[in-house]
A protein has these predicted regions:
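N-terminal glycine/serine-rich phosphate-binding loop of ATP-dependent small-molecule kinases
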Residues: 1-83, 98, 130, 181-190
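Phosphate- and other anionic-substrate recognition elements at nucleic-acid/protein interfaces
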Residues: 101
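Acidic, His- and aromatic-enriched active-site or binding-groove loops in soluble protein domains
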Residues: 86
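Gly/Ser-rich phosphate-binding catalytic loop and adjacent alpha/beta segment
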Residues: 93
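Carbohydrate-associated surface elements
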Residues: 90
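Gly/Ser/Thr-rich active-site cleft segment
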Residues: 104-198
């Protein structure tokens, strides 16, 4: 956590050491890791502000959420995480990344969210029929703190190719068609809402 002033100078910070775990063939963090990490970072920040300036922060002019780009968090209609968070370190999406790269004529890295979703569909994973939306770690934290499905354009660029402040429309249609042929009928704009609501 970093606190800056109105001239963008850092005036305090807080941190927590954490490391992802390799479980069941997947690099992951648990929701408890995520929630506890945020709380610990903020507590450390607040205590550092108190130590340096003699006060605890009570309000802020603005806040921003930044986390590791890419990865895959799939949720059902009740906001339940369907499979453990798959971080950017995972290299289980080679087939999907290759097929999407060929389909779009645009390099899709294995770590991108769309590659993870596409691979889950290819693998006919049990959770796929229950997906209501997907998100990244930063998008998830933003949703938890603000109840809004939004990601910045930088974060969005690790989900699906972007153009301007949205996802590249000419790539959406062939991707949706290919997914539909494999039984996944959601539109990309619906998974998550942040596909079309970028900050």
């Amino acid at each position: 956590a970093v606190l800056i002033d109105d001239s963008f100078s850092v005036i305090a910070s807080g941190s927590k050491q954490w490391e992802n775990r390799f479980e069941n063939g997947c690099w992951t963090y648990s929701l408890d890791d995520i929630h506890g990490g945020i709380q610990a970072c903020y507590k450390d920040l607040a205590e550092n502000v108190k130590a340096q300036y003699g006060i605890y922060p009570e309000t802020y002019g603005a806040m921003g959420i930044s986390a590791m780009m890419h990865g895959y968090m799939a949720f059902d209609k009740n906001d339940k995480l369907l499979v453990p968070f798959r971080t950017w370190r995972n290299t289980m999406t080679a087939q999907a990344a290759g097929e999407l790269t060929k389909l779009l004529g645009f390099n899709i890295p294995q770590r991108w969210s769309i590659a993870h979703l596409y691979q889950a569909v290819l693998n006919k994973e049990a959770h796929v029929p229950y997906i209501a939306y997907i998100n990244t770690l930063a998008g998830y934290v933003h949703k938890r703190l603000t109840d809004r499905f939004e990601v910045g354009v930088g974060e969005a660029s690790g989900i699906f190719p972007v153009e301007g402040i949205g996802y590249k429309k000419e790539y959406c249609e062939p991707t949706e068609k290919s997914l539909a042929e494999k039984g996944f009928v959601h539109k990309l704009k619906d998974i998550p809402v942040s596909y079309t609501h970028l900050t």
